[in-house]
Amino acid sequence: MSPKSKSTNKTYTIVIKLGTSSICDEKTHEPLISNLSLIVETVVKLRKLGHNVVLVSSGGIAMGLRRLDLPKRPSKLSAVQAIAAVGQGRLISLWDTLFTQLRQPIAQVLITRNDIAERSQYVNAANTISELLHFGVVPIVNENDTLSVQEIRFGDNDTLSAITAGMINADYLFLLTDVDCLYTDNPRTNPDAKPILKIHDTSMVNANVSTPGSGVGTGGMKTKLIAADLGTSSGVNVIICRGSKPSSIFDIIRQESSDNKNESVELPLHTHFVAKKQGRIRDRHFWLLHGLKSHGSLEIDRGAFEAITRTNRAGLLPVGVTKVHGHFSAHQAVTVIYNGEEIGRALVNYSSTEIDLIKGKRSKEIASILGYNETEYVAYRDYLVVHGLNSHHDSQVSSDEH
């Protein structure tokens, strides 16, 4: 995996997410060839400067709608999946045609949440993208809409792009949209709305500044704020800028690469969500939080909360569990709740039935209650992540973790 750049040439790993509105006309669903060409030129320029670039591209469903001459996206999931099957091939073919003009090879990477639910699959996905970058290829990532079922979908490519950026330890995630930046209010309806240029804490941003997502896509400003939170928590700088001006990416990166940040350079309007330098989520913890679907929840008491949040934190013992919700098996992910609020995720060693029997009990009682004792912990420390407390983001993903 490409490490964070520390050398003087300041090359970066950059993920660029393109929404449907940046790829196809919202009404006719015709591909916006001129805009796509500008994006291709920008990516190739970034590559020539030594940066690694990954595209996360929406547009498969819109391309399918155009090919089948359908007026709008249907609500039935199976119909959407069929349309995606028609459009995805046409979308990647269009990208390949445009990139080929500049002799830039690309690769299609289709992902579902199920593909990264197992740790080994998550590592393989990250390593595959890493190898593509090593070969000088531009990976083009999209959710596999043809296979994803509602329960395990990422839901939108903003989320997918943030997970991809965290998975490959990217430096920047650019979310290209139909507005220049985040505003204090909707600029389409309020002429007094002010641009917000830099944000250090995503929790301080009011999602009511949002603009509506397109009728074809599933996004909107709310999903971008969620993506910004995911990205910055894993050490990725997240930037929102206008998709019709992709060259702004080049200008922003060039400014970030400059040794003189104070020089007077007029940059295009954009919003920069600054990466968290403290409390960044480690790779394994990022996978636990965002790669896995929660199958239930555990409520814990104050003693357990203090034990798992202290500096030399411990694993979760059964004595600290007060309630069990849902039906899940051993080795599945669950939400951890304290005082009615989600505080993190855990990969449990026992099923919901087993934990319900041993909750509130000391570990030495497990064998007498269950008839066996797999481990004294409900969840090991390394498979327990608490929001905002897990630091030291791994520099790379490898397959030899223990």
Swiss-Prot record:
Which residues are noted in the entry as ATP-binding? Answer: T177, D178, T218, G219, G220, M221, K222, T223, K224
Which CDD domains does this chain map to? AAK_G5K_ProB, PUA_G5K
Q: Where in the cell is it found?
A: Cytoplasm
Tell me the superkingdom of the source. Answer: Eukaryota
Known pathway:
Amino-acid biosynthesis; L-proline biosynthesis; L-glutamate 5-semialdehyde from L-glutamate: step 1/2
Give its E.C. classification number.
2.7.2.11
- One GO cellular component term noted in the UniProt record for this chain: cytosol
Start and end residues of each PUA domain: 295-373
Q: Name one GO biological process term.
A: proline biosynthetic process
Q: Per UniProt, where does substrate bind?
A: S58, D145, N157
Keywords noted in UniProt: Amino-acid biosynthesis, ATP-binding, Cytoplasm, Kinase, Nucleotide-binding, Proline biosynthesis, Transferase
Q: Quote the catalytic activity from the record.
A: L-glutamate + ATP = L-glutamyl 5-phosphate + ADP
Q: Name one GO molecular function term.
A: RNA binding
Per the annotation, which location comes first and is thus the protein's main one? Answer: cytoplasm
Q: Which HAMAP family match?
A: ProB
Q: Which family does it belong to?
A: Belongs to the glutamate 5-kinase family.
- Its job: Catalyzes the transfer of a phosphate group to glutamate to form glutamate 5-phosphate which rapidly cyclizes to 5-oxoproline.
Q: What is the protein's given name? A: Probable glutamate 5-kinase
